[in-house]
């Protein structure tokens, strides 16, 4: 597959580009580290620069968890994600929704939030709109 912008690195990212271009819905999931994405997710975001002009009409969702005690601690990661989508907006892409699992420092903490129910409802909505 030919991209308008070619990534100079020839690695497994080519397959990720292909999957992103074929998808209608793209979900980014990352724990919050120091108010923003972990390094792996930031690397993925940076690497998608190679397809920014060819990725069109996608619906983006953000799923994130963190030990932070309240939603305000997630403002930076949400703003960063919105700015990322803004860079891609030229192609009709949009940031649809986010699920923020705050106070989730332990594996079972997520079950004490409404995050699982919200994720389920979003997945149902996506399925209905396919």
Question: Where in this protein do the model-derived segments appear?
Answer:
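Helix-loop-strand module that forms the ligand-binding subsite of alpha/beta enzymes
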Residues: 8-89
């Amino acid at each position: 597959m030919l991209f308008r912008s070619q990534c100079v690195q020839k690695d497994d990212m080519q397959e990720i580009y292909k999957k992103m271009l074929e998808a209608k819905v793209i979900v980014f999931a990352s724990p919050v580290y120091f108010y923003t994405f972990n390094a792996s997710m930031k690397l993925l975001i940076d690497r998608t620069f190679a397809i920014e002009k060819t990725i069109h009409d996608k619906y983006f969702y953000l799923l994130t968890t963190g030990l932070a005690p309240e939603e305000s601690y997630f403002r930076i990661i949400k703003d960063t994600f919105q700015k990322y989508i803004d860079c891609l907006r030229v192609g009709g892409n949009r940031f649809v929704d986010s699920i923020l699992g705050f106070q989730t420092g332990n594996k079972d903490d997520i079950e004490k939030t409404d995050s699982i129910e919200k994720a389920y409802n979003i997945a149902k909505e996506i399925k209905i709109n396919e």
